[in-house]
């Protein structure tokens, strides 16, 4: 094997030793006294929401006391699991002053609106990725959380994985020199979908579907709209995997370096827009400049972020591992990080943030940075134009009317930001 082709496995990166899982992660640790617990309400407990719900159940200093979901079976199942209350209306959870934090694991178009209601109700939040439906939502989220002084944790669990931590530490510590190029790959989005109207299932009901749509346009129910993966690929409700999965490798990019803050950001490229129902961008291939750093952001069959230094050394971080251009780069790297703040228990990190008043590792500032790149990419594809962003003023530079039109979207009454 050639040295330059060497694949640094986790063992060579210092993470090959057995992983010791705390008993609390398995639900075996004795719960803390009630006075020391952070009370949690779970908003959205289907699919991914159920996974997140269970991760907070496993935290010894947390107590999940209420759940809300539009689907009757989901909220009743989860309420039975945690021994808490089941609500149709998430606002009943937010109105309870005894609840400290909430998880927001709804369809994408509800992420920021519910998070804003929660912040104004003085609840800290776990918010599933992607962040916002528009640039306006993203910026409003940061402003409202700062005003209300509550904690925000993003659903970028890769920050809790040792391989990702080590890779970002290597880049931050200068092991590959000055970063000159970054390659960001994300799984592709979907297309197709059947928009044919059909009866609303009894488990959801007319009121449930109306609440499920919320601020999104009023449209007839169809099964492909509400199925777990389908909702990610409908533009009324999402920007697709540009944000929905792109959030993960883009988050690694901003965690490892600050190129997106170093100068003007320019985004241009190509992509396809599907249909008849799934009409978000797929097959994208974006060319991005972050100051003087070149970034390729493209759809692929994997999740990966590769950092290339000025002398050719590189580090590639992906969900299940870490590669480097040379085994020497990572051979002596231990977990005593000096350039990244890390945790190995994602849900517990939010609980500790609330208990000890500290910022979660997966924080809102970085969520805004990565989500902004996703939105700039979406705007560039949809307008077939180069988009320029000023990261200091946090606004588009000399935007066209078509670009301006995509910065925000109307919300259906009575929902607002």
Regions found by a protein language model. Give the residues of each.
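Beta-strand-loop-alpha-helix segment that lines the small-molecule cofactor/substrate pocket
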Residues: 107, 112-160, 174, 384
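NAD(P)-dependent dehydrogenases' Rossmann-like dinucleotide-binding region
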Residues: 44, 175-193, 208-222, 265-274, ...
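C-terminal segment of N-terminal export signals and the immediately downstream linker at the start
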Residues: 20-60, 64
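Rossmann-like dinucleotide-binding domain that binds NAD(P)(H)
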Residues: 210-292
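NAD(P)-binding Rossmann-fold cofactor-contacting core
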Residues: 63-78
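Basic phosphate/pyrophosphate-binding loop/patch that engages nucleotide-derived ligands
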Residues: 143-149, 166-180, 200-204
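N-terminal secretory signal peptides and thylakoid transit peptides that target proteins
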Residues: 1-14
